[in-house]
């Protein structure tokens, strides 16, 4: 709640629309000893308070079909996010699509820009065309991600909103052994490059 309040204040001050994003379960942590989060039921209670207090649209990740089915029953979550590692999981994409909510798919680090067409096609079979795709870097050897900015142009051709995730683009997966590292000093430059191309 404190984070939502502060972000809401900052965005109101500068005139930016805010979508509040929070993961209730970080299911793909590097180490079994890392904190993961809370149960979806508990998270929904917190999300409801955020929506009531600040009137913000809310985005959260899902990791299985049961979570999609549970979110299908509520009006709290506005946008369902598919994690990058799960972006090709057909049953998960279909379950998310069947909620008729907005779906944001994180493009897998292993996918080419043209591969996202298959993601769109899967979700479209549910008659849900409220889809967004997020670029978050491409694997480049071990523990390193890079950005090919031609990919943003290519993905825009499919006429769905393209988002650029600068923070995950500078991630170094597993770079610290039992957790990921990162190079945050490059975030401003990558954001400028993405803005120059034009993203959602």
Task: Say what each PLM segment does.
Residues 1, 18-40:
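Glycine-rich, proline-tolerant flexible connector loops at the mouths of alpha/beta enzymes
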Residues 4, 68-85, 90-97, 173-200:
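A short alpha/beta connector and helix-capping loop motif
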Residues 4-8, 43-48, 68, 93, ...:
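Generic structural signal for well-ordered alpha-helices
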Residues 8-15, 51-53, 72-75, 94-99, ...:
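Acidic (Asp/Glu)-rich catalytic clusters
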Residues 11-23, 200:
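N-terminal glycine-rich anion-binding loops that anchor highly charged ligand groups
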Residues 18, 58, 162-163:
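Residue-level marker for buried hydrophobic side chains located in beta-strands
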Residues 37-39, 53-68, 77-91, 101-113, ...:
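Catalytic beta/alpha-barrel core
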Residues 99-200:
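Catalytic alpha/beta core domains of metabolic enzymes, predominantly
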